[in-house]
Curated annotation (Swiss-Prot):
<dbReference type="InterPro" id="IPR029047">
    <property type="entry name" value="HSP70_peptide-bd_sf"/>
</dbReference>
<feature type="compositionally biased region" description="Low complexity">
    <location>
        <begin position="600"/>
        <end position="620"/>
    </location>
</feature>
<dbReference type="GO" id="GO:0005524">
    <property type="term" value="F:ATP binding"/>
</dbReference>
<dbReference type="Pfam" id="PF00012">
    <property type="entry name" value="HSP70"/>
</dbReference>
<dbReference type="InterPro" id="IPR013126">
    <property type="entry name" value="Hsp_70_fam"/>
</dbReference>
<feature type="modified residue" description="Phosphothreonine; by autocatalysis">
    <location>
        <position position="196"/>
    </location>
</feature>
<feature type="compositionally biased region" description="Basic and acidic residues">
    <location>
        <begin position="501"/>
        <end position="528"/>
    </location>
</feature>
<feature type="compositionally biased region" description="Basic and acidic residues">
    <location>
        <begin position="621"/>
        <end position="637"/>
    </location>
</feature>
<feature type="region of interest" description="Disordered">
    <location>
        <begin position="484"/>
        <end position="528"/>
    </location>
</feature>
<keyword id="KW-0346">Stress response</keyword>
<dbReference type="GO" id="GO:0140662">
    <property type="term" value="F:ATP-dependent protein folding chaperone"/>
</dbReference>
<comment type="similarity">
    <text>Belongs to the heat shock protein 70 family.</text>
</comment>
<dbReference type="InterPro" id="IPR018181">
    <property type="entry name" value="Heat_shock_70_CS"/>
</dbReference>
<dbReference type="InterPro" id="IPR043129">
    <property type="entry name" value="ATPase_NBD"/>
</dbReference>
<keyword id="KW-0067">ATP-binding</keyword>
<dbReference type="InterPro" id="IPR029048">
    <property type="entry name" value="HSP70_C_sf"/>
</dbReference>
<protein>
    <recommendedName>
        <fullName>Chaperone protein DnaK</fullName>
    </recommendedName>
</protein>
Amino acid sequence: MGKIIGIDLGTTNSCVAVMQGKDPVVIANAEGYRTTPSMVAFTKSGERLVGHAAKRQAITNATNTIFSIKRFMGRTQDEVPEETKMVPYQIVSEGNQARVKIGDKTHSPQEISAMILQKMKETAEDFLGEKVTEAVITVPAYFNDAQRQATKDAGQIAGLEVKRIINEPTAAALAYGLDKKQSNEKVAVFDLGGGTFDISVLELGDGVFEVRSTDGDTHLGGDNFDQILIDFLADEFKKQEMIDLRKDPMALQRLKEAAEKAKIELSSSAATEVNLPFITATQDGPKHLVVNITRAKFEGLCASLFDRILEPCRRAVKNAKLDVKEIDEVVLVGGSTRIPKVQQLVKEFFGKEPNRSVNPDEVVAVGAAIQGGVLKGDVTDVLLLDVTPLSLGIETLGGVMTKLIEANTTIPTKKQETFSTAADNQTSVEIHILQGERPMSTDNKTLGRFHLDGIPPAPRGVPQIEVAFDIDANGILHVSAKDKATGKEQSVRIEASGKLSETEIEKMKKDASSHADEDKKKKEEVDTKNTADALIFSTEKQINEIGDKLPAENLSKIQAALDRLKEAHKTGNTATIKPAMDALTKEWNEAASKMYGTEAGAPGAAGAAGAAGQGQSASSGKDDEVKNADFEVVDDK
């Protein structure tokens, strides 16, 4: 049996490691470097270059040199307008999926990533002297299902069986904590890489690595800092020469390399000079770009990016149910954490010096290799418990999202609940699967829909439909629905969630906070309407069953109160629905008192309670609880 290698498939650079005995080893590539640029180039002669070879020729072959492909993984064309502007190569849409066009051929991001993974695979094979077929590959913690699936697909294209997809901050924590199994620590892993930002809070102890919460921004990384410098340099040159260098692919590539170099130099120097001779030429002769940039200027230009760093940190600590003071260590991961301002912000927020004991460029690959060792059995006494970043559920009566799996739930996990029908003789139900944090279905992301047919006709609330959500260790969701009476089952693996962008995720969370009062009001309105609907249903049922036993006067009053409630229900105004419900319940109580000569609970009130138990989402977590989903009535006639 061969080794399971660990690969950090990064936006800017990639790295591969493997367990040798009890120790993880980072493997240098053929050029002698321990990290490999995540770049692929296609030359005029048809040759394909990967890594350093691609980077060396990028200036003279800018439109055919692909970098930052990770930003396009598992994303539709609609989700990457800003990313498309940042690259000199052509991004086109095929079925609304982002594709790279080179000449007359298009490549999927998975294909390009597979070329990088092949390079890492070959690097490992050269080192080990044997074939490698299995790997653990890391992804940003905030990657959605489609992005994770795209990463798995890239591995398969590269000839690798992807044994596990794990989150980058979690992998870093594994590497950091491997020799600290006996200590009990609460660790925040701050991961700012080339294209993404993640923050995870973990609890380490006795070999258990438990993720308490995770947050992040998949549109924030070193590329964004580079882009701001590129725009600054281009604008400065335009002021002097009235020429926009961004329209020249070769000049733009030179600007990109100069911006990245300046950013790196400003991490150790207070100022740097960008000097690009012969950047372009006009009728008057060659033009040169010379611009001085101070660290203060850089920090001022990038202020908006620095501001975006702290909010995910606040949410991650809050969702972990911890105080910032309870965090024992802050581990920095990713090359962009070398920026002094980033380190300053982290220190100020957490109130302690960040831990820089790990190599930010290699630690994620090391963690992936350790996880490979765990899966292989070479590493024992280590248990990794990761989480899902967003809540998952289905739409129920009144357009409410009923959550089955809460955000930051440890995965793998399975949760099931029992729901029922919303109408008499309903023979088909539609399961509307949602992801997000808002109470109303319309405010959340639709992951998919599917139907369960063949339900025997029965009164509403009688059929029992068991809905199960199952998230595997890779974070991929499976949903099934089963009719308990017939045993008929329908299931689906959710991959449509790939259409969920980071912008949408951030919007969901921010909206959930800023619209909290509005959401609460909407939820109360729906709950009131659902209760009224259940009361109407149960009252009509009771009238049909025992109406002839009621005194005529009381029956008339009940019918009048019922009609008023129906009218109020049609208006949707809770201010009129609640008094109408109270009036109907009062009439039932009076009728019941006369019937039984006692102050016993009214049949209508009892019926309402019973129907409410079936007809709307209750807060109980029991699996056998019957809830009323917003299912679609299918006419079989």
